[in-house]
Amino acid sequence: MQNHPADQEPRRVLGSFFAPKSQNTPTWEQRKLGEIAKEVVRNDPASDAPIMMITAGNGFIEQSDRYAFNNAGESLKKYILLECGELAYNHGASKLRPYGSCFALTTVEKARIPFVYHCFSVEKSNPEFLSIELNGANVENQLRKIVSSGARMDGLLNIAYSEYTEVTVQLPKKEEQDWIAKFFKHLDTLIALHQREHIKPILEVKRVKRNE
């Protein structure tokens, strides 16, 4: 049984609800991402921060949740050390997000993430709100125009950091950004609980079958 689209990706379904309307939200302004973002390139080969990656549906997850072994290898020493509140754009195409995914790190203080990600910080904007905006249809349409030759052999879209930060985003006042980010966080929690309740009967059937 397939999940409802809202269960799979609430931001994609509801993101347009918050799109600025000039007639009733005059405080929203249009800015280039490069005007508000500062690139993050720090790394620390000696760090013991968790090794994480970005998935289109769940944002940051520990690499061990996806793979049974550490597949970073020698490249681990080049991994970017991202700090809580900073953002990373995974420009790998996926079925859910054909033009990549951007998320803010919020679950841990620091994380080591693949050096191929485009990483940045923002000082005067809410990073969680910004990730919602950057994963929305407005930015996706801009990225579609940037991608001229499809995916490279490594599966990454040919979008450089300098090109990514040329996209424009719509920004309300900081207080409204905070409210929207909080709303979506609460929504994600409710959806997770909803999915958990639906999977309980399935897990119970599996348990009974296993003990037969």
Task: Name these PLM-found stretches.
Residues 1-212:
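Feature detects amphipathic, helix-rich regulatory segments
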